[in-house]
Amino acid sequence: MSYPQARIGVIGGSGLYQMADLADTVEVQFNTPFGPPSDALVIGTLAGERVAFLPRHGRGHRLLPAELPFQANIYAMKMLGVEYLLSASAVGSLREEYRPRDIVFPDQFFDRTKDRPSTFFGGGLVAHIGFDQPICTELAHLAAEAARGVELIGETRIHTGGTYVCMEGPAFSTLAESRLYRSWGMDIIGMTNLQEAKLAREAEICYATMALVTDYDCWHPDHGAVTVELIIDNLHKNAENAQRIVRAVVERLHAAAPPCASHSALKYALLTQPEDVPQATKQKLAAILAKYPAYRPEV
């Protein structure tokens, strides 16, 4: 089956369930080798580019962080031909200067999740990708510069760099955990982006996180503990800013998409010899392995 193609993908998190600026849209239902993604993907035109949008938790926010079909979500983007993927995500701040309604483009992750699927490989094919720089530097820089060039509503500030600690959830942090993460030098905290970043790297998709700060987690002595009401309220206030930034990022990618090492992440990562890989595994990973002829499934 052939699918409409899109070079740019956007994953929307809590509070960002649609992209109103997309024109000429089509909705595509997927059934990937890893099951269906969180929801149908909406593909449309924005600033001269075809863009694929996926609401991470599904429309209606139906999926817990640990229930997200991370593999299917990224594989669906790969099937559409996505090369650049921007992920919008609600986060708590672990630093005084990262205020609620600020936006952060982090450059590192720290994993505190438990047994979530975070690789496409196995089943007779071993691969080890480089992940020392989990965020694609070129895309994150482009996105941050685009954000700084946008007229933002309110007092939103743009920050670059920092570490996103990915917690299991769905409960928010204890005070002890929040204080510990701060003592470790972590900057923001969320529940979803680490697995996306790993899988995007394996799929050779350039990936960056746009983290929307909603709260101070629970460490701040002058702010109450985080609540869903607080998160959603700040996300709604910042939704228009997020939409404006996404448009600006797409415009810049349309004008001059940067080269990215992620686009060849598998070049030296595949360890198993092609003749030793089961045909079923080659077929399952066909979209990811397509540019490596020796690993393509037999017709």
From Swiss-Prot:
Keywords: Glycosyltransferase, Purine salvage, Transferase
Signal peptide interval: none
Record GO cellular component, one term: cytosol
Key word Transferase present: yes
Bilayer-spanning residue ranges: none
Highest rank taxon of the organism: Bacteria
Gene Ontology molecular function: S-methyl-5-thioadenosine phosphorylase activity
Keyword Ligase tagged: no
Residues where phosphate binds: 14, 56-57, 89-90, 192
Record pathway: Amino-acid biosynthesis; L-methionine biosynthesis via salvage pathway; S-methyl-5-thio-alpha-D-ribose 1-phosphate from S-methyl-5'-thioadenosine (phosphorylase route): step 1/1
Pfam families: PNP_UDP_1
Binding positions for substrate per the UniProt entry: 191, 215-217
CDD domains in alphabetical order: MTAP_SsMTAPII_like_MTIP
Catalytic activity: S-methyl-5'-thioadenosine + phosphate = 5-(methylsulfanyl)-alpha-D-ribose 1-phosphate + adenine
One biological process term in Gene Ontology: L-methionine salvage from methylthioadenosine
Residues flagged as site, Important for substrate specificity: 173, 228
EC annotation from Swiss-Prot or TrEMBL: 2.4.2.28
Function statement: Catalyzes the reversible phosphorylation of S-methyl-5'-thioadenosine (MTA) to adenine and 5-methylthioribose-1-phosphate. Involved in the breakdown of MTA, a major by-product of polyamine biosynthesis. Responsible for the first step in the methionine salvage pathway after MTA has been generated from S-adenosylmethionine. Has broad substrate specificity with 6-aminopurine nucleosides as preferred substrates.
Family: Belongs to the PNP/MTAP phosphorylase family. MTAP subfamily.
Subunit structure: Homohexamer. Dimer of a homotrimer.
NCBIfam families the UniProt entry points to: MTAP, PRK07432.1
Name by which UniProt lists this protein: S-methyl-5'-thioadenosine phosphorylase
Native species: Gloeobacter violaceus (strain ATCC 29082 / PCC 7421)
